[in-house]
Every structure is written in C-alpha cells, then in structure tokens.
Design a protein with these regions (language model features):
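Active-site-proximal helix/loop segments of hydrolytic enzymes
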Residues: 2-147
Length: 147
C-alpha cells in the first residue's frame, strides 16, 4: 500500500497539508516503530493504510477502519474516510475499535488504520486497480474533510 499512501500524501501536499511518511521505500517497519516516528514529528493525525485479508479468497469485500476508541476525533476521521471510499465503490464495513493494535495504542494523536479492500478478493483488487487514483483522492478528501 506504499504507492497508495504516497499518492494520498501527494494530494494532501497539493492542499497545503504537511505530510510526514514513516517510509517512502518498500521496507518493513514495525507498528511500534511507525507510531514512535509519528510521535517524534508531532503529527496532528496518523493514518496507516493497508489491505485486509481473509482466510479464504473472495470471502469478504470492502473497506474497514480501525481506531483506538469509537469516540473522538479518530472515529470522525475514520467515518469520513470510509464514506469517501464507499463513494468509490468499496463496501463500507464500518469502524472497529481495536485498542490492542500497537499503531493505535502507541500514538499520541488521533490515529486510524484503514484497510482498503481485501488483497485476496478479486472484486476489491479489480476496483482498486481500476480506480486507484479515485481511492487515493477519496482517502485524502476524507482527511481534508475533518481538518
């Protein structure tokens, strides 16, 4: 999801938002390391972009967003991003509370983890391939909506 994250960042920067990346190359960083990097730069928000997976191919479809708590600014950000991705064509699986996730419980700012479709679902892959730019714009606009 690095390419999608970079595309989202480009759109945000075009809209005069300062963007910090935990990585710009395809190298692994642990969720804790990512959270600590976000804290170190004093980010106002932290958005972690991923693809979901299920035990069986084509079992599930759609976008899901995870937050530390269903209340507060992170939940509003998640709602905004999900709604925008739903307009692109992704099924909206909603917002999930997941305080056990390190990237959510180690950050000091409102944080969301966005799962943009299922990597093992053909329909989600086809949608993301066909509407990659729209998905990037949707995530960026979901962020801009709450700034």
């Amino acid at each position: 999801m690095l390419a999608l994250s970079l595309a989202v960042g480009d759109i945000l920067e075009e809209n005069r938002v300062n963007v910090y990346y935990t990585r710009t190359e395809d190298v692994y960083e642990s969720p804790v390391q990512k959270a600590l990097e976000g804290n170190a730069v004093g980010a106002d928000y932290f958005v972690s972009i991923h693809r979901n997976a299920s035990p069986y191919s084509n079992q599930y479809t759609g976008v899901a967003t995870y937050v530390y708590s269903l209340f507060g600014q992170a939940a509003r950000l998640a709602e905004s991003i999900n709604a925008r991705l739903e307009q692109v064509g992704f099924a909206n699986q909603g917002i999930n509370e997941a305080p056990q996730l390190a990237v959510l419980n180690r950050t000091q700012m409102p944080t969301v983890l966005v799962e943009v479709g299922y990597i093992n679902t053909d329909a989600d892959n086809e949608l993301l391939d066909a509407r990659f730019d729209d998905a990037a714009r949707a995530i960026a606009e979901g962020i801009l909506d709450i700034l």
